[in-house]
Amino acid sequence: MASMWAPEHSAEAHSNLSSTTDDCGSVSVAFPITMMVTGFVGNALAMLLVSRSYRRRESKRKKSFLLCIGWLALTDLVGQLLTSPVVILVYLSQRRWEQLDPSGRLCTFFGLTMTVFGLSSLLVASAMAVERALAIRAPHWYASHMKTRATPVLLGVWLSVLAFALLPVLGVGRYSVQWPGTWCFISTGPAGNETDPAREPGSVAFASAFACLGLLALVVTFACNLATIKALVSRCRAKAAVSQSSAQWGRITTETAIQLMGIMCVLSVCWSPLLIMMLKMIFNQMSVEQCKTQMGKEKECNSFLIAVRLASLNQILDPWVYLLLRKILLRKFCQIRDHTNYASSSTSLPCPGSSALMWSDQLER
């Protein structure tokens, strides 16, 4: 998703901009710039760490997991680079979108890009959660049956989402300029006199499909992560009863459970408001486009804008919850442990070269 930190007073909402509004607009442009730079740095760091770890790994399963994380970071990074500059350009121009894009092709490209990179990120995260749950809950079945390489699966997900996002180009669904006029996305309903009644059923179906697919991906991710946490706790208790390294297993389980809960919190906070609000607007036969022509829609329009802002944060937070924070916190923990000599070498958690895959080495035993 793009960095949609739009100002509350846009050129489209107010055609007669005063100097004060211009000043506000120039200040507001700092938001999308900050979002783009922050997302670029985080995802670039994640890709660098994944690349270094990938070259050191010999296990195909671990390489597949690293490839999924790298693909997710690349997806978020490319999505930002394709959309954020357009938003910044609209901010700085202080002109209506229709003046910058009279043909509507840029709007279609923008909406398609947001759909592809937003939905593909959700589906890739869901696929990673499924693989993680199978590897932990049924390791022997997973090792003997899961022979598919990660690359074809990731390409299949991306191409499927691309085919879905191209439906509005074929006449099923519609991408339109969204309030306050600085971005384009899926139309959820009628837009006053501008809407073609013949295309409205297709728009509703397409928007509903996007929201339902996104919510389904969230549900699958939540269910698989909870199943993984439950399996980790059960295995930790079993290991503690027969092994002397119960402290090590406790640390591994706690750290992994915290990371998985962090992933669930980030996904729910970032995506649930937008997807649920889209379904609500479809049910109420409302579209954000109506904010340009109808009074009394300020509350709904502001709520939808906040929901899109939250969704845009997912691109920035993804590399941190999946990789960067785990590596940083683990190193900090090891530094504290080494400083206090808390654990002996026989039960200490391995620190050199630790990464998001550290726990998988232990769980295979």
From Swiss-Prot:
Location(s), subcellular: Cell membrane
Keyword match Glycoprotein: yes
Record-given protein name: Prostaglandin E2 receptor EP3 subtype
Keywords per UniProt: Cell membrane, Disulfide bond, G-protein coupled receptor, Glycoprotein, Lipoprotein, Membrane, Palmitate, Phosphoprotein, Receptor, Transducer, Transmembrane, Transmembrane helix
Biological process terms in GO annotation: adenylate cyclase-modulating G protein-coupled receptor signaling pathway; bicarbonate transport; fever generation; phospholipase C-activating G protein-coupled receptor signaling pathway; positive regulation of cytosolic calcium ion concentration; positive regulation of fever generation; positive regulation of miRNA transcription; positive regulation of urine volume
Post-translational modification remark: Ligand binding is affected by cAMP-dependent phosphorylation in brain membranes.
KW Transmembrane helix (keyword) present: yes
Species in which this protein is naturally found: Mus musculus (Mouse)
Coiled-coil features, chain-numbered ranges: none
Disruption phenotype: No visible phenotype. Mice are born at the expected Mendelian rate. Females have normal fertility. Mutant mice have normal renal function, urine volume and urine osmolality. Mutant mice fail to develop fever in response to pyrinogens, including IL1B, prostaglandin E2 and bacterial lipopolysaccharide (LPS). Mutant mice lack the normal potentiation of platelet aggregation by prostaglandin E2 and display prolonged bleeding times and decreased susceptibility to thromboembolism.
Biased composition, class Polar residues, residue ranges: 13-22
